[in-house]
Amino acid sequence: MKTAVYPGSFDPITKGHLNIIKRASKVCDKLIVAVLVNPEKKGLFSVDERVEMIKRVTKNHSNVEVQCFSGLLIDFMKEKKSKVIIKGLRTMSDFEYEFKMALMNNKLDPNIETVFMMTNAKYSYLSSSSVKQVAMFGGCIKDLVPDEIIPDIKKKINHKKECI
């Protein structure tokens, strides 16, 4: 496997995402973490902020690149000459959604394959949405996101509570 693409919004990146990145980077020559630009969806962090945070937490993984994209994932894949999409799965409901997306991507380009990776069980409950919700209500996010981005989240949420 040469180049694989791990797409998502990563708003913000979680320890579950990072688990998939670390594992996926071991089975390909190059892993592109592709941050989706979705103008219809207002995120907590801008695309540039998300890209910067992911670069920070993956800096020790020499074969991981972080880029943003808009439009069809298939077009981005062609531009990057990649034929493999990496998708992390937490639950059966994730599988149902991602399976449909994989079929659509394969319909658009039969040369594209989707590889599903199960998230480590200790992160199976974790989502970016739940991280934002916990942070907004003053909960501790230390076990949910990489340490390097906790200050970014606190600053965005404007919350001063310290995790102990």
From Swiss-Prot:
Keyword set includes Transmembrane helix: no
Binding positions for ATP per the UniProt entry: S9, F10, H17, G88, L89, R90, E98, Y123, S124, Y125, L126, S127, S128, S129
Keywords tagged on the record: ATP-binding, Coenzyme A biosynthesis, Cytoplasm, Magnesium, Nucleotide-binding, Nucleotidyltransferase, Transferase
Pathway the protein contributes to: Cofactor biosynthesis; coenzyme A biosynthesis; CoA from (R)-pantothenate: step 4/5
GO biological process: coenzyme A biosynthetic process
Disulfide-bond pairs as recorded: none
Binding of substrate, residues: S9, K41, L73, K87
UniProt similarity note: Belongs to the bacterial CoaD family.
Protein name: Phosphopantetheine adenylyltransferase
Species annotation: Clostridium botulinum (strain 657 / Type Ba4)
